[in-house]
Each structure stands twice: as C-alpha cells, then as structure tokens.
C-alpha cells in the first residue's frame, strides 16, 4: 500500500475529521473568549479598581519588567474557556445518558416474532 493511500485512509477516518473540526472550533471559540475578556471583563475590573488598565500593570525588578496584569488577563481567559468546556462536556454526558436510558425501538420483525410466540404459547396451552 502506498504511503499516500495510507495517509488518505488515516485522514478520512471519522476521529481525525472530528478532531480537525474540534480544533477549528476551539480556535474560533478562543477568539470569542479573548474578545470577551479583553473588551468587556477586564475594562469593568479596571473601572472597579479606579480606571486602571489591568493588562498594562507591571513592576520592574532590575532590568526585567514583570507584566503581571497581562498574566492575570490570560488566567481569566483560561478559566472562562475551561469552564465553558466543562459545561459543554457535562451537557454532552447528560444527553448521552438520556439516549442510553431510552428503550430501543421495537422493529417490525421483533414485533411480529413476539406475536407469533404469544400465539404459539396460547395454542400449546389449549392442547
């Protein structure tokens, strides 16, 4: 089997395609969360702290500038993304549990076989 053919089979497997979609959606979601944190949450926190730009907060030790405000902003980004993923996974697990608890629909063949069994059982008891 050629290397190209093996790669094509690998790339077209369901799991790989699902992963690719998840990565693209994750990148897009990260942009939304970053915009939320940078544009809404951090300015509000800055207003509560007296109009301070949180991302610009830093202190200097010797020649090194420690940008702790930027770090704080990224921590808030991470917490929001992690919480959103947690909620999404909880929702998916809940839906999967509900689906697993639903009885499987009875097919027409099974229903017909059940009726035949019941008729045979009734007829054998009459003999």
From Swiss-Prot:
UniProt keyword Ion transport present: yes
Pfam families: MscL
Cell membrane among keywords: yes
This protein's UniProt keywords: Cell inner membrane, Cell membrane, Ion channel, Ion transport, Membrane, Transmembrane, Transmembrane helix, Transport
This protein's GO CC annotations: plasma membrane
Disulfide bond annotation, renumbered to this chain: none
UniProt GO MF annotations: mechanosensitive monoatomic ion channel activity
Transmembrane annotation, as ranges: 9-29, 32-52, 75-95
Membrane topology, as annotated: Multi-pass membrane protein
InterPro entries from the UniProt entry: Mechanosensitive_channel_CS, MS_channel, MSC/AndL, MscL_channel
Signal peptide as annotated in the record: none
Compartment annotation: Cell inner membrane
Biological role: Channel that opens in response to stretch forces in the membrane lipid bilayer. May participate in the regulation of osmotic pressure changes within the cell.
Subunit structure: Homopentamer.
Record family assignment: Belongs to the MscL family.
Protein name per the record: Large-conductance mechanosensitive channel
UniProt source species: Legionella pneumophila (strain Corby)
Gene name linked to the record: mscL
